[in-house]
Amino acid sequence: MAKRNRSQFRIQERTAKKRKHEDSLLEGNVFQNAPEDMDENTIYSAKGSSWDEEEQDYEMVPRKNRSDTSNLVEGLPIKVNGKVERKLHKAQEKPKDDDEEDEDSNDSSEDDEGPNEEQEAEAKEDEPDTEEKILQLKEDIADLVTKVMEEPEENTAALGRLCKMVESKNPNTCKFSMLALVPVFKSIIPGYRIRPLTETEKKEKVSKEVSKLRNFEQALVYNYKNYVGRLQSLSKTPSNAAPIQVSLGILATQAAKELISTASHFNFRTDIFTLLLRRICKPRISTDPTSIQIIQTFETLLNEDEEGSISFEILRIFNKILKTRNFNIEESVLNMLLSLDVLHDYDPNTKLKGNVSAPKLKKKDRVHLSKKQRKARKEMQQIEEEMRNAEQAVSAEERERNQSEILKIVFTIYLNILKNNAKTLIGSVLEGLTKFGNMANFDLLGDFLEVMKELISDTEFDNLSSAEVRKALLCIVSAFSLISNTQYMKVNVDLSKFVDGLYALLPYICLDADIELSYRSLRLADPLNNEIIKPSVNVSTKAELLLKALDHVFFRSKSGTKERATAFTKRLYMCISHTPEKTSIAILKFIDKLMNRYPEISGLYSSEDRIGNGHFIMEADNPSRSNPEAATLWDNALLEKHYCPVVTKGLRSLSSRSKECSK
């Protein structure tokens, strides 16, 4: 009983001391200054409790479990003294991901949220792409392309996202999306130009389908414009830039080439034409792998254009670029003009005949229409005009206008090249003048003839190469082709310079080994030749050009005389001894035709009953100075033993005809 009372007394005493101590702490604000993380042991130590009642530090430390294998990884077991022992080693801790650290930093700083997101996007673009990322990128692009191809009007957002990906700084994203958009645009581009809506059309009420179609057309034009602009910026990459940028520029050029082959009628075709023409209008295009394909694309467009609008647009841009580049381009680029097919049925003389306007009807002969009827007729005419514009139906007058403008630009380009004396392009210019010369305008005739006379005068007839012989022949044929268009006008032009040049060329033509060969001839290409060879559209051989020039001199112009016919016959007989079989036969047929027009040349076959002063000067390059009346065709006796029986037969026929003419 006494023990129980003592224990109760002690408990009460201890409780009283505890309360007193807590009251003193409250009065001294000790709890307010105490740290928040103060545990219960610290509080009891502050009370002054006895050491026996407090828990010691080592009692609070958890016991070590030696068998804890949470951080251990079991390796391969080993066998020691016949016993198998387990081998454990510590597992390597994985470092924290950068993404988690970025998320923590983003959560801590909400104010810098916008700039951090942009930096993260740029950092992601700068990161090298792994195979997994590239595969995922291809799958995403394929999904977007599938959506647009299946329902283009419903998925304009997917089209916009693809166009946005082209502007990415990541080269893989830019490349894959740019190439993927080519078949997309080729399939969804309509067969007509899309014009902007007028203010009246925007305000008027339309059906759901029309509104849906208009929204799709406007979205298509907007995205297509951005895409073409991106192609333009990429294609301007210089060749000394980074290899990745150069490859992107080549891919952009190829994409533009593919687009324009099917979308030449659509909006922004001028931008694509400019992009491609700037790419090939260079002094050396052999370094550009896309140049040959671009030239072939333009040739196809010029050859298939029947209306003339595409050809006119291409030539207008081409002329402008040529002036800025000072005509410093390759010949294969200029040869594109020879593919123009829209001029094949153009006759500039019909314009003069068709300009006669129909006589106006007198007032008494007109059909009387009321004011209401006139208004209705005017509205109907406007509707018909809008329908024609929508259908892009080109009338005969518009086509003829396009042909006239195209021909004007072509001759302007050729004349400027001749005036600037661009030697590498003269051959192509003469090819073009030979093809289009008969359509030349009378105003340009004098300029062309003056330039061509200078070319013939500057030609040194001492030692000419095969290419120089062809250029001189083309110059002569072109000059006569230009004059042939003026037959309906009374124009007298002195062409003696070209006749003398043709006479001087004959010895070099007959000694040319390739006189009957063109680029179509069956010959193996030189494997060591790396140049881009664009054969001319005018595939005439030198023999054909020679016969064409002779025909112009004696049968299509007033340049032929008895004296010139005699001199040319003598020199042509000298050429037959060296020319191949087919050329020799063709020359004999020409002489037979010439004898019908100028029977005086029959005197060359015999020296009987003929009075001649002096002797024939064989070395003279001017027919009037060679004294042709004193010439004799002693070559006939030599050529009678020619290896070709057809040539021998032709010579005998001419000899017998000469005897009939001299009687």
Swiss-Prot record:
It comes from the Eukaryota. This is Nucleolar complex-associated protein 3. GO terms for biological process: cell division; DNA replication initiation; pre-replicative complex assembly involved in nuclear cell cycle DNA replication; ribosomal large subunit biogenesis; rRNA processing. The modification Phosphoserine is found at S395. It is found in: Nucleus, Nucleolus. Residues 1-132 are annotated as: Disordered. One of its GO terms (cellular component) is Noc2p-Noc3p complex. Residues 82-97 have a biased composition (Basic and acidic residues). Keywords: Cell cycle, Cell division, Coiled coil, DNA replication, Nucleus, Phosphoprotein, Ribosome biogenesis. Residues 363-408 form a coiled coil. It comes from Saccharomyces cerevisiae (strain ATCC 204508 / S288c). The gene is NOC3. Required for synthesis of 60S ribosomal subunits and the transport of pre-ribosomes from the nucleoplasm to the cytoplasm. Also required for initiation of DNA replication. May function downstream of the origin recognition complex (ORC complex) in the loading of CDC6 and the minichromosome maintenance complex (MCM complex) onto chromatin during the G1 phase of the cell cycle. Essential for growth. InterPro entries: ARM-type_fold, CCAAT-binding_factor, Noc3_N, Nucleolar_cplx-assoc_3. Belongs to the CBF/MAK21 family. Its main location: nucleus. Forms a heterodimer with NOC2. This complex may be associated with pre-ribosomal particles. Also interacts with MCM2, MCM5 and ORC1. Present with 11700 molecules/cell in log phase SD medium.
